Amino acid sequence: MSTTRIPVGGRTELRQRLDEISGSSPEDIALHQGRVKTLSAPCPHSIKYIEDGGGDRSDCMVYALEIPLDLVVTTAIFPNILHEFFTLALSRLLEQMPASEVSEGHVVLYFKDGETKHVGRIQGNRVSSKWGKNPVYKHDISEVPASYGDEYEVLKQPSVRYITNKFIEFARRHPRYVDISDIFDESVIKCGYKS
């Protein structure tokens, strides 16, 4: 894995403040868009609200990679399955892109201490990503909360079928799979994949 450092360029305070305004309660999520907008006075930025992104049932991985929400929600019973796929397996499954070949739809993974913390999609010369349970924003590559880390890499966008199949394989090999196998297999079929 070859990562690139996020350019600092006066973004340290913005990134720290973005961490401070992130919440997880429904009230926090509803107010998040306004908080981001208000930050532009003390910390000028180009972050733009795109959509709510499925609210509190979705996250950056579901948004950027389009893994069916039903599968993610099913594995949320044991968050380690999703967390381990995201932090340990995802970057190894995708093809790294040289900076000169980065284009629309490619995936941006953000890292902290070598662990994947966030994922977004390239749209034009910006990134579109869902910040936890908060809305989807379009932003510069450096305009993300500090907790997402200081390094990133751009990878080729996988097909939805490919990445979903890899997620299913990972979940089925996980030690906790036995605890969710029936409900997970129902979700796999419901989402149009083979059980």
Q: Model-predicted segments: where are they?
A:
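N-terminal capping segments
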Residues: 2-91
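Polar low-complexity intrinsically disordered regions enriched in Ser/Thr and small residues
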Residues: 12-13, 108, 195
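Generic structural signal for residues positioned in beta-strands
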Residues: 62-63, 107, 126, 153
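...with weaker cross-activation on analogous glycine-rich loops/strands in unrelated enzymes
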Residues: 79-136
